[in-house]
Amino acid sequence: MLKELLYDYKVPLDKKVTDFDVKVSNIQVVRDFIQSWHYSKSVNGLRISHVFGLYCDDNLIGAMIYGPLGMANAWRKYGESESDVIELRRLCCIDETPKCTESYFIGKTQRWLKKNTDHKIIVSYADAYHGHTGVIYRATNFKHEGLTTPGRLIKYGDKTYHDKAIRTKYKNVLKPFAQKLRDALESGDAHYINTPGKHIYTFRLR
């Protein structure tokens, strides 16, 4: 219901993807949009480096977040330094967009990253648990690198969280939400879900 209330904009039928604008943005602008349109419903815990918005006539119709890899030291598999590697952390658009909207959006950000940063490779994951196999990545010349090992998520309310969310600390003290999740697991209000491996995709910027 939230997304219908906040984002009831419909792309005019005569619009083509090349009519859309991709703009550098920030998390404050896209937070509510992502929490409404991305399957994770969350940006909690993301380390964020670059944020982009996709616009049609100044209406936000898509959002994308890039940041360091979520798994500690995972960058070593792809680059010589952590700054070589950037992960596409979130991508979502409103439902009613023309064909190829997401691939157009990704392509624009790929070119921006190549021109404006020193990153050498983009890594992204297609979440098989949510039925994603990476069609959009294959359409934008990403290379399929295999699967991650199976994992597990914490289901709490209508959202899921990585199991590392219960271990996040600030100055050696559990963050409030981490403690809240732990309490929910103990009370039975939250539970673990076993998940299949995610599809790994990479795109070389240089």
Feature map (PLM): residue ranges:
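Short amphipathic alpha-helix that is part of the acyltransferase structural core
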Residues: 4-46
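A short, polar/charged loop/turn motif at coil->beta-strand junctions and beta-hairpin connectors
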Residues: 16, 28, 60, 80-82, ...
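Acyl-donor binding region in acyl/amide transferases
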Residues: 21-24, 49, 67-187
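Conserved beta-hairpin
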Residues: 34, 48-68
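Short, P/G- and charge-enriched loop/turn segments at secondary-structure junctions
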Residues: 40-41, 184-191
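Short hydrophobic/aromatic beta-strand or adjacent loop that forms the aromatic wall/cage
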Residues: 196-201
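Short beta-strand-to-coil "C-cap" segments at the C-terminal boundary of structured domains/repeats
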Residues: 202-206
